[in-house]
């Protein structure tokens, strides 16, 4: 809205990003208590898995879920004020945000209604993810410009691969994998949102660099015209995420639920696709990938041997069972996530 006024100051990306971040954060602090109270009145409580850590049944019962509503409401309102709402990348990201959030909302709603941890049937959830990812990646493929189907590899500036139309299924895989990985990691107070903040911060740096032709040429990375609006979007997401963490930090007053986790993963995955940072994103999301692999390994080994590799999966529950406190697990995973982010950002220069 402000951007369309044409004021000179609003042409500066860093200015709009800063105020999009602050706006979303402050709005979260203002509306957060009201949303939490409303969800409590609606009895939208987190439904816990009976096979999860036993202490969660006593400590986390009665905490409202669907906290993704808080995140994305504040992000969207901030974007309306500070972003160029006509930018094609902005429109794609917003579609992904609302599409996957809607899917997660249905899942959360069914869990609350049925009073069980089994919400939307797995196949219907996957169908929804396929539909939303196919639409968004296809739009990106046809409107995304000259670099859209090319995969760039860290460390090797001259090595790249053009997937052509096969970029669409590749991009769909990134979105669905990221969405589900973030969903699996959302099990402890502040864990998933804290890791998301780290990734968002790193992607802001990447988005700013790719939006600048001079920086992109110096670092031998593609210059993505129009990607400056991703800096604004990610700034708003960063502010909204910090605002949510204010209430989600231990002991949490609200959980993001599938409404938040499914959409957050998809949003950051789509951002990586637009910025041509698909391989780099696999480093950024290292903790999420490890968490997902722990579940896959646990299931495969147990089916074949009836033995468990981990005391409990995903991996964060394994460390809880080893005696780590919840905050120890969360902060140590944040540290590991930050290390992955530093490694990922360092690859931009090492080419």
Swiss-Prot record:
The chain crosses the membrane at residues 17-37, 62-82, 85-105, 130-150, 163-183, 190-210, 230-250, 254-274, 281-301, 328-348. Pathway: Cell wall biogenesis; peptidoglycan biosynthesis. It is found in: Cell inner membrane. Pfam families: Glycos_transf_4. It catalyses: UDP-N-acetyl-alpha-D-muramoyl-L-alanyl-gamma-D-glutamyl-meso-2,6-diaminopimeloyl-D-alanyl-D-alanine + di-trans,octa-cis-undecaprenyl phosphate = di-trans,octa-cis-undecaprenyl diphospho-N-acetyl-alpha-D-muramoyl-L-alanyl-D-glutamyl-meso-2,6-diaminopimeloyl-D-alanyl-D-alanine + UMP. One of its GO terms (molecular function) is UDP-N-acetylmuramoyl-L-alanyl-D-glutamyl-meso-2,6-diaminopimelyl-D-alanyl-D-alanine:undecaprenyl-phosphate transferase activity. One of its GO terms (biological process) is regulation of cell shape. Its cofactor is Mg(2+). The keyword Transmembrane helix applies. It is a multi-pass membrane protein. One of its GO terms (cellular component) is plasma membrane. Its EC number is 2.7.8.13. PROSITE patterns: MRAY_1, MRAY_2. Its main location: membrane. Keywords: Cell cycle, Cell division, Cell inner membrane, Cell membrane, Cell shape, Cell wall biogenesis/degradation, Magnesium, Membrane, Metal-binding, Peptidoglycan synthesis, Transferase, Transmembrane, Transmembrane helix. It is an enzyme of class 2 (transferase). InterPro entries: Glycosyl_transferase_4, PNAcMuramoyl-5peptid_Trfase, PNAcMuramoyl-5peptid_Trfase_CS. Catalyzes the initial step of the lipid cycle reactions in the biosynthesis of the cell wall peptidoglycan: transfers peptidoglycan precursor phospho-MurNAc-pentapeptide from UDP-MurNAc-pentapeptide onto the lipid carrier undecaprenyl phosphate, yielding undecaprenyl-pyrophosphoryl-MurNAc-pentapeptide, known as lipid I. Belongs to the glycosyltransferase 4 family. MraY subfamily. This is Phospho-N-acetylmuramoyl-pentapeptide-transferase. The gene is mraY.
